[in-house]
């Protein structure tokens, strides 16, 4: 399967089992920490520094923009992404979600900072993603690379308990690239963007 021809490609076992297990445990604990901090009013409900519970796409579900561990992964996987896409890329941002039972990801295309997008299955119950009308099942460690701004993608209602995904986003290295999603560097929250 060719990324250039099909606008998406699946890489099986792109991330080692050891790294996947670390990321899964890390994000499960991070979600718990965020819940405790919000629930006990240690941080206000509008803080995004520990992630948030809900966004415009998936309400009431834990998500985090620009997590430092995920953004290190974004940089470390860039050579593999360049090899598979045959494009010179720059990192833009990461986003993590811990989907729960009943969640739906509506059919959409991504924004400008997501020219080359990847979804990495970190763990939990399997949940197919549809890309350009094709049903794709990713196991932990598998990555789907796709042209996020061009390919419609979605997920039907989730029937499992939890499914953790990390989204890794890149732009082609060209003058109008959204380097670091308009932040000074990786790892910063989205409110630091220079828009």
Question: Language-model segments: which ranges?
Answer:
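Non-heme Fe(II)/2-oxoglutarate
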Residues: 1-85
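A short, polar/charged loop/turn motif at coil->beta-strand junctions and beta-hairpin connectors
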Residues: 4-5, 90, 162
């Amino acid at each position: 399967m060719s990324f250039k021809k099909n606008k998406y490609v699946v890489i099986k076992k792109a991330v080692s089992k050891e790294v996947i297990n670390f990321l899964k445990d890390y994000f499960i604990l991070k979600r718990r920490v965020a819940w405790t901090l919000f629930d006990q009013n240690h941080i206000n409900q509008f803080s995004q520094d520990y992630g948030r519970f809900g966004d415009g796409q998936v309400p009431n579900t834990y998500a985090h923009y620009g997590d430092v561990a995920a953004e290190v992964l974004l940089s470390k996987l860039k050579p593999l992404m360049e090899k598979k896409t045959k494009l010179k890329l720059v990192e833009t941002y990461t986003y993590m979600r811990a989907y729960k039972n009943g969640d739906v990801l509506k059919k959409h295309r991504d924004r400008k900072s997501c020219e080359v997008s990847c979804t990495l299955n970190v763990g939990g119950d399997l949940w197919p993603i549809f890309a350009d009308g094709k049903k794709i099942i990713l196991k932990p460690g598998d990555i789907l690379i796709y042209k996020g701004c061009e390919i419609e993608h979605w997920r039907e209602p989730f029937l499992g308990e939890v499914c953790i995904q990390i989204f890794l986003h890149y732009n082609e290295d060209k003058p109008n690239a959204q380097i670091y999603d308009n932040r000074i560097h990786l790892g910063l929250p989205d409110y630091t963007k220079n828009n």
